[in-house]
């Protein structure tokens, strides 16, 4: 499962020993931990190899540790050093720090270390690593995820003048004695590839990824993994009454679309009648100028990421089909481009959402909630047990939680469940409240609701309260606001590159796995 414009995803292999012959352009990645950072002992900080036996000889380990001492390595988290060890059948050894020793390692500590190492590989074509043999549940899959995600790059639109001269990483060999290692590594590779698919979609510029094109790519990807696919064009949307989606898209020469992707996994369940049904909804604004309520020019180019929610949902439902989750998953993806023009909706317009609720559009830059409202009502018509939706909803999310922590809103119990799982997988969602009194701020003098409040504060929560009005009462619901986390405008870190991150693909898929296992 890959997007059409992405770079090559490396293949993953499992082995129990190093190759017997030297492999050119290859790197051995070895984790190291900190030692001697104790004020009472006065011992000088240093680094020692972790998880290398039985793959490396005592002499090779001693040579690596001698090199680390010469470099004053401390084994601090994400610290990398490159060494040449003549006795090993690789071009070089790359050590990556894990920090202080632990009896067990969390998957995200390993994932992040693997990502940091992958970003330091340079032109290496193949890597071998002992990271997957560290003690701890889930570290095998996490090591693979980190290596794939850390080596991710997007060069589809570079000419020969600036395109990478090398082919990139194409082979990962995991050294491990872990039981079921092949299964765990395959799972990690599939998850990482889905995240890369979401990244590719977000990184594709709006000149090349407009509503009809995103719908086409979703259809191609969906059909490749056996999903049922339905695409509604602008005429079908108008006829069916998708007023929010039509209203947001009417200012653009590129008309809106609605995509439905269905995975019927109940047939795979032990008891098909008891299999849960999950609805996914993701905001797909392929470019957001703000419309008539236009955004500042300085940072508008980042709005290529305003379809990050749609990208994550498309990748997630495709992954559910690929890995044959025994639950039903139905994704509803509203897609539009928000542009100012003579045909654009105006502040003060009233539109009728799918399902009949009328909304006064006080600010055309609060467009995501309008297309999501249509999609939520349509998704709830399928009577799902759970609804998970995600979007780059509000700039207020970054004010409240920063650029790396998604805000999770919704039904109290399910919201907390989603946030907890998000933290477990390293995407670090944080539960947020939806105070009932904020609904009063959405009163309109001419319609059922206004799309924004007149207050400066609690913008993320107000948007969540607006969306809650369209969720069926019987449905457990969570919204993941990834306005900041979906797109990294700063420097790369861990397994996260500059640009599209793929958040919250791993959260949503992990929630689906949890529902499949526990209901």
UniProtKB/Swiss-Prot annotation:
<feature type="binding site">
    <location>
        <position position="365"/>
    </location>
    <ligand>
        <name>Mn(2+) 1</name>
    </ligand>
</feature>
<dbReference type="InterPro" id="IPR000819">
    <property type="entry name" value="Peptidase_M17_C"/>
</dbReference>
<keyword id="KW-0378">Hydrolase</keyword>
<dbReference type="Pfam" id="PF00883">
    <property type="entry name" value="Peptidase_M17"/>
</dbReference>
<feature type="active site">
    <location>
        <position position="369"/>
    </location>
</feature>
<feature type="binding site">
    <location>
        <position position="367"/>
    </location>
    <ligand>
        <name>Mn(2+) 2</name>
    </ligand>
</feature>
<feature type="active site">
    <location>
        <position position="295"/>
    </location>
</feature>
<keyword id="KW-0963">Cytoplasm</keyword>
<keyword id="KW-0645">Protease</keyword>
<dbReference type="InterPro" id="IPR023042">
    <property type="entry name" value="Peptidase_M17_leu_NH2_pept"/>
</dbReference>
<feature type="binding site">
    <location>
        <position position="367"/>
    </location>
    <ligand>
        <name>Mn(2+) 1</name>
    </ligand>
</feature>
<feature type="binding site">
    <location>
        <position position="288"/>
    </location>
    <ligand>
        <name>Mn(2+) 1</name>
    </ligand>
</feature>
<feature type="binding site">
    <location>
        <position position="288"/>
    </location>
    <ligand>
        <name>Mn(2+) 2</name>
    </ligand>
</feature>
<feature type="binding site">
    <location>
        <position position="283"/>
    </location>
    <ligand>
        <name>Mn(2+) 2</name>
    </ligand>
</feature>
<dbReference type="GO" id="GO:0070006">
    <property type="term" value="F:metalloaminopeptidase activity"/>
</dbReference>
<keyword id="KW-0031">Aminopeptidase</keyword>
<dbReference type="InterPro" id="IPR043472">
    <property type="entry name" value="Macro_dom-like"/>
</dbReference>
<comment type="function">
    <text>Presumably involved in the processing and regular turnover of intracellular proteins. Catalyzes the removal of unsubstituted N-terminal amino acids from various peptides.</text>
</comment>
<dbReference type="InterPro" id="IPR011356">
    <property type="entry name" value="Leucine_aapep/pepB"/>
</dbReference>
<dbReference type="Pfam" id="PF02789">
    <property type="entry name" value="Peptidase_M17_N"/>
</dbReference>
<dbReference type="GO" id="GO:0030145">
    <property type="term" value="F:manganese ion binding"/>
</dbReference>
<feature type="binding site">
    <location>
        <position position="306"/>
    </location>
    <ligand>
        <name>Mn(2+) 2</name>
    </ligand>
</feature>
<keyword id="KW-0464">Manganese</keyword>
<comment type="similarity">
    <text>Belongs to the peptidase M17 family.</text>
</comment>
<dbReference type="InterPro" id="IPR008283">
    <property type="entry name" value="Peptidase_M17_N"/>
</dbReference>
<dbReference type="GO" id="GO:0006508">
    <property type="term" value="P:proteolysis"/>
</dbReference>
<keyword id="KW-0479">Metal-binding</keyword>
<protein>
    <recommendedName>
        <fullName>Probable cytosol aminopeptidase</fullName>
        <ecNumber>3.4.11.1</ecNumber>
        <ecNumber>3.4.11.10</ecNumber>
    </recommendedName>
</protein>
<dbReference type="GO" id="GO:0005737">
    <property type="term" value="C:cytoplasm"/>
</dbReference>
């Amino acid at each position: 499962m890959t997007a059409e414009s992405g770079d090559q995803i490396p293949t993953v292999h499992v082995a129990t020993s190093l190759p017997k012959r030297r492999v050119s352009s290859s790197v051995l990645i070895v984790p190291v931990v900190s030692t001697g950072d104790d004020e009472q002992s006065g011992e000088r900080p240093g680094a020692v190899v972790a998880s290398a036996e039985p793959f490396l000889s005592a002499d090779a380990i001693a040579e690596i540790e001698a090199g680390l001492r010469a470099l004053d390595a401390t084994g601090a988290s994400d610290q990398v050093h490159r060494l040449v060890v003549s006795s090993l059948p690789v071009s070089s050894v790359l050590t990556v720090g894990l920090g202080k020793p632990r009896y067990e390692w969390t998957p995200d500590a390993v994932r992040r270390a693997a990502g940091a190492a992958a970003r330091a590989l340079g032109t290496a074509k193949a890597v071998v690593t002992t990271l997957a043999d560290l003690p701890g549940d889930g570290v095998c899959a996490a090591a693979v995820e980190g290596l794939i995600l850390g080596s991710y790059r997007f060069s589809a639109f570079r000419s020969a003048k600036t395109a990478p001269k090398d082919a990139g990483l194409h082979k990962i060999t995991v050294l491990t004695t872990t039981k079921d290692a092949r299964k765990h590594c395959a799972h990690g590779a599939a998850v990482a590839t889905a995240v890369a698919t979401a990244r590719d979609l977000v990184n594709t510029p709006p000149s090349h990824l407009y509503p009809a094109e995103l719908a086409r790519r979703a259809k191609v990807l969906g059909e490749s993994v056996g999903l049922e696919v339905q695409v509604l064009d602008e005429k079908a949307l108008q006829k069916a009454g998708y007023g929010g989606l039509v209203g947001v898209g009417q200012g653009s020469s590129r008309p809106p679309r609605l995509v439905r992707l269905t995975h019927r996994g109940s047939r795979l369940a032990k008891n098909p009648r008891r299999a849960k049904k999950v609805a996914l909804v993701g905001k797909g604004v392929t470019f957001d100028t703000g419309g008539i309520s236009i955004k500042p020019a300085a940072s508008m180019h980042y709005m290529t990421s305003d379809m990050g929610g749609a990208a994550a949902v498309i990748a997630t439902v495709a992954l559910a089909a690929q890995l044959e989750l025994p639950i039903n998953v139905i994704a509803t993806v509203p897609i539009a481009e928000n542009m100012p023009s003579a045909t654009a909706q105006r502040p003060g317009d009233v539109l009728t959402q799918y399902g009949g609720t009328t909304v006064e559009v006080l600010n055309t830059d609060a467009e995501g909630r309008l297309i999501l409202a249509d999609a939520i009502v349509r998704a709830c018509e399928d009577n799902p047990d759970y609804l998970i939706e995600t979007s780059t909803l509000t700039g207020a999310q970054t004010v409240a939680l920063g650029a790396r922590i998604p805000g999770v809103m919704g039904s109290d119990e399910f919201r907390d469940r989603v946030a907890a799982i998000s933290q477990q997988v390293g995407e670090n969602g944080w539960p947020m409240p939806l105070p009932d009194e904020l609904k009063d701020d959405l009163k309109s003098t001419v319609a059922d609701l206004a799309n924004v409040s007149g207050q400066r504060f609690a913008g993320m929560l107000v948007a969540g309260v607006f969306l809650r009005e369209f969720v069926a009462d019987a449905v457990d619901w969570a919204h993941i606001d990834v306005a900041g986390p979906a797109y990294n405008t700063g420097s790369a870190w861990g397994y996260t590159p500059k640009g599209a991150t793929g958040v919250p693909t791993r959260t949503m898929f992990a929630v689906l796995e949890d529902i499949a296992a526990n209901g």
